[in-house]
Regions:
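Long, contiguous binding/interaction regions
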Residues: 1-296
Length: 296
């Protein structure tokens, strides 16, 4: 592939494996499209797909998968720990190779127009594609979630960019946009207290006076009897993963709580992990050029 765009659509289904297979199917066996990864989480009740491709075939595959999700997912019956406003909650496009951010923005708008036309879904443009500053932050767009969107979408400042000014009865709304790569990073705590996880998340996220390029929220993992600080690192080159890990450790200690593990959701740039490994190993003057796989 000469021109490569990455797309990481998030779907509000993390439990029904048959539905998950049907949603992922449009990304398989398509020329010009490569499915890199998909992961589902039962507690979050969410599916995250990572796919790359040439802009045009990638666009077509994404639109097909959105159609499947709209058909299969009824948010009136959806319960999960992750905030959501749509069956297809968010569809970000990330320029990877020989594609500019401006071209990724244009692609996101093209997809947004088509989603509204085909599936009668209200579409909000966010991040680099946002039509207004207050729509750049996904959390602001999604505030109120599926249930609250019925009234929110009627407000003049929250009219959708494309599609009807009315929440879809079962599929809700969708955010589509272009952005830089982010790392979805979750840190697990040995406490069942969601209040503690929320408090720690508030302390580490930028909006609460914490780390720049860090978004965080507390999540309950009921099956395991623990909680989690769920983090999006929106620019790992400016704020490293280990900084988030260490700040969570410090804040957790105030509550007598420990970290029991962490996880990466989806794919992660090698540089993000090398940076963290260098920090904990105390490596001096280490560079990507010393990584065997990077030289092959």
């Amino acid at each position: 592939m000469n021109r490569i765009v990455e797309c990481v659509p998030n779907f509000s289904e993390g439990r029904d494996l048959q539905k998950i297979d049907r949603i992922v199917a449009p990304f398989r066996g398509k020329q010009g499209v490569k499915l890199l990864d998909y992961s589902n989480d039962e507690d979050h009740n969410r599916l995250v797909v990572t796919v790359v491709g040439e802009p045009e075939p990638l666009r077509d595959a994404v639109l097909e998968a959105i159609g499947v999700a709209v058909q299969l997912i009824d948010l009136n019956k959806h319960q999960g720990q992750h905030p959501r406003m749509g069956a297809v909650d968010v569809v970000p496009f990330i320029p990877i190779k020989n594609v500019t951010m401006e071209e990724a923005i244009a692609l996101s708008k093209e997809v947004g127009v088509e989603v509204a036309k085909r599936y009668n879904l209200p579409v909000f443009l966010y991040e680099k594609s946002a039509s207004a500053p207050h729509r750049e932050n996904l959390a602001a767009v999604r505030k109120g979630e599926f249930e609250g969107m019925a009234e929110k979408i009627k407000l003049p400042e929250w009219q959708p960019d494309f599609g009807p000014a009315e929440r879809h009865p079962t599929a809700g709304t969708v955010a589509v946009g272009a952005r830089m790569p982010l790392v979805a990073y979750n840190i697990n705590l040995n406490t069942p207290s969601l209040e503690i996880a929320h408090d720690i998340a508030k302390k580490i996220r930028f909006i609460g006076g914490g780390l720049r390029y860090c978004k965080a929220m507390g999540v309950e993992l009921k099956d395991r009897g623990i909680t989690q600080v769920s983090i999006n690192m929106t620019d790992y080159t400016r704020t490293a993963l280990y900084r988030a890990f260490e700040l969570v450790r410090v804040e957790a200690r105030r509550y007598g709580v420990s970290i029991v593990g962490s996880e990466i959701i989806g794919l992660v740039p090698m540089a993000a992990l090398i940076d963290t490994a260098s920090y904990y190993l105390g490596l001096e003057n280490f560079s990507m050029e010393q990584v065997l796989e990077a030289r092959m």
